[in-house]
């Protein structure tokens, strides 16, 4: 029986897709539709070479998925005819979903109910699910939740110091994101260290335009930096991460900002974008560090925040840390950021191997600390698509 899974990841203005063999991890197709809802909406894909096409002015998720089915997959019948199931990345599952789920009407309603917790993401996921059901009515669909891995967090980690009834009645608590990536890295480290997953203690740094840190104890998430929403925690591309909540009142009451303006500022105009006042692109910050004030400022704040989180999470691991790991677009490719962060953690006896660190870029992986380092640091490429494909195959009965 075929175990080819179509993996879909619908963002607010993008659609990432892949066809993955859940049995051996082979990726037969990958692509990205981006700038959706804008005049420059386009789609790029890798299938027997690299390709790109314009989707048309204002094209949305439905048009992107239709192009993928009717043009890309249609050019490779052996792929489309052997698709066995569809897996969907879903950012927020609240407390309702502690693991991946076969999509039914009830599950779809549950995802819709969580939309207020991820207003940029969950509505897009719902569009993708419904479009996939329409395009492939015979295939089972599975939802794989970013929040599920973090449902093992203890109360001391997920509760906010707010009136308790806000949690009991409204579910206001820390949920965390990037769980699929944190889970994959945990499994990879177990293999690299020749340990059972249940014995692995790591601090994983998933660094991309969105970024989070996760403390993993005995193979389970015990704390993570993102909170009720993906806004909390680290400095990100356009998101502010941790701030004094009273800043919001000051912006509203003293400076006259509307709630909508504050929301836009914190989610789309802050982070590296806000600190540089130029761009959210980490490559600009890295390339101009020490030469341009705005780049230096942004990189220092980014690394300071990340190092503080890593250091703080050592307190959750009962005195044993097997490795610090870096993944995600920035984590896998930015040697300067990794070195700056690890150098700030010298109190833990960490020593960076600069040569190994430079080699661990653009697909390179491995240990980036010296043999004398008390704690190893590693670069590992994440593969969320594989985790989604494996869970989808399992729940679809493939």
From Swiss-Prot:
Name of the protein this chain belongs to: Acetate kinase 1
Binding site for substrate: 89
Key words, A-Z: ATP-binding, Cytoplasm, Kinase, Magnesium, Metal-binding, Nucleotide-binding, Transferase
EC number: 2.7.2.1
Main location per the UniProt record: cytoplasm
Top-level lineage group: Bacteria
Cofactor: record remark: Mg(2+). Can also accept Mn(2+).
Subcellular localization(s) per the UniProt record: Cytoplasm
Gene name for this UniProt entry: ackA1
UniProt source species: Vibrio parahaemolyticus serotype O3:K6 (strain RIMD 2210633)
Catalytic machinery residues: 146
Biological process, per Gene Ontology: acetate metabolic process; acetyl-CoA biosynthetic process
């Amino acid at each position: 029986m075929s175990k080819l899974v179509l993996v879909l990841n619908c963002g607010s203005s993008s659609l990432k897709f892949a066809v993955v063999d859940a049995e051996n991890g082979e990726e037969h197709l990958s692509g990205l539709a981006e700038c959706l809802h804008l005049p420059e909406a386009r789609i790029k894909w890798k299938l027997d070479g690299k390709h790109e096409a314009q989707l048309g002015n204002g094209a949305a998720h439905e048009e992107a998925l239709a192009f993928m089915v009717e043009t890309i997959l249609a050019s490779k019948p052996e792929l489309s005819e052997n698709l066995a199931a569809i897996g969907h990345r879903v950012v927020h599952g609240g407390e309702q979903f502690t693991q991946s789920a076969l999509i039914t009407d009830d599950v779809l309603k549950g995802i819709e109910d969580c939309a207020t917790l991820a207003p940029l993401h969950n509505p897009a996921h719902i569009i993708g699910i419904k479009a996939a059901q329409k395009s492939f009515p015979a295939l089972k669909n599975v939802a794989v939740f970013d929040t599920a891995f973090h449902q093992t967090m203890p109360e001391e980690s997920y509760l906010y110091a707010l009136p308790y009834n806000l949690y009991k009645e409204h579910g206001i608590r820390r949920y965390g994101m990037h769980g699929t990536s944190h889970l994959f890295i945990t499994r990879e480290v177990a293999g690299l260290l020749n340990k059972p997953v249940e014995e692995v203690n790591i601090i994983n740094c998933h660094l991309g335009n969105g970024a989070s840190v996760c403390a993993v104890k005995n193979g389970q998430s015990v704390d993570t930096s993102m909170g009720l929403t993906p806004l909390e925690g680290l400095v990100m591309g356009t998101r502010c991460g941790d701030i004094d909540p009273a800043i919001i009142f000051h912006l509203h009451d003293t400076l006259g900002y509307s709630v909508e303006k504050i929301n836009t500022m914190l989610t789309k105009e802050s982070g590296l974008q806000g600190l540089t006042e130029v761009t959210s692109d980490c490559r600009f910050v890295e390339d101009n560090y020490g030469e341009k004030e705005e780049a230096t400022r942004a990189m220092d704040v980014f690394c300071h925040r990340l190092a503080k989180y890593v250091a703080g999470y050592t307190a959750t691991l009962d005195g044993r840390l097997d490795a610090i790991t870096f993944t995600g677009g920035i984590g896998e490719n930015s040697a300067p950021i990794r070195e700056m962060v690890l150098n700030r953690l010298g109190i833990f006896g960490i020593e960076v191997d600069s040569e190994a660190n430079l080699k661990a870029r653009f697909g390179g992986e491995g240990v980036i600390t010296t043999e004398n380092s008390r704690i190893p640091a590693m670069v590992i490429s994440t593969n969320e698509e594989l985790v989604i494909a494996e869970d989808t195959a399992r729940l679809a009965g493939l």
